[in-house]
Amino acid sequence: MSLISRLKAVVAGDEYLDDDFDELDYATEDELNDINDFKQTQRNSNALANSNPFDFMNNNRSSKVVGMPGISNSSSEVSLMEPRSFDEMPQAIQALRERKTVILNLTMMDPDQAQRAVDFIAGGTYAIDGHQERVGESIFLFAPSCVNVTSSSPEEASPSSVSPKNTPQYSVENNTAPEPAWGNSKLSAFS
């Protein structure tokens, strides 16, 4: 049927689509029963295959084993990378995405490329809510969010120990309290 003849049939109100429908085949009750029996057989065979042969010993007792917090069944993996160019950085990001800790030794790279690499990995680490830590000169630790990173010296980990290069540094030698605002503390109003 062409487009023009269909349009004419629609305007005239003819039953123009009767020829295009196929009869739907509905499953009979016997076929539905056969399908359900097959599914039940599959479930039973899967349950038997997955069952533990030692389950008969544990039927009468309840398990009192409690997992320790912070310890997972999967082993943690650390990836040590010593890249020579920036082209190797996507491998470090992939390792972080696979929930592996990455130690990046950038001593073999040009300083400009190393800075670019650290910025790239730091961005990827931030995107997955991970942690980053400078371990040594040109050595960095990047960890996914599932790994807690702690520092043995609190001074290194504190954000106050890191300051911009152009900011003047102030040190306070005297730890005594400042003088009160009303004047000399040695003088009293009643003397």
From Swiss-Prot:
Disulfide bridge partners, by residue number: none
Localization per record: Cytoplasm
Gene3D superfamilies found in the cross-reference section: SepF-like protein
Any one annotated GO CC term: cytoplasm
GO annotation terms (biological process): division septum assembly; FtsZ-dependent cytokinesis
Region annotated Disordered, chain positions: 150-191
Main location class: cytoplasm
Function: Cell division protein that is part of the divisome complex and is recruited early to the Z-ring. Probably stimulates Z-ring formation, perhaps through the cross-linking of FtsZ protofilaments. Its function overlaps with FtsA.
Record note on quaternary structure: Homodimer. Interacts with FtsZ.
Family per record: Belongs to the SepF family.
Name of the protein this chain belongs to: Cell division protein SepF
UniProt gene name: sepF
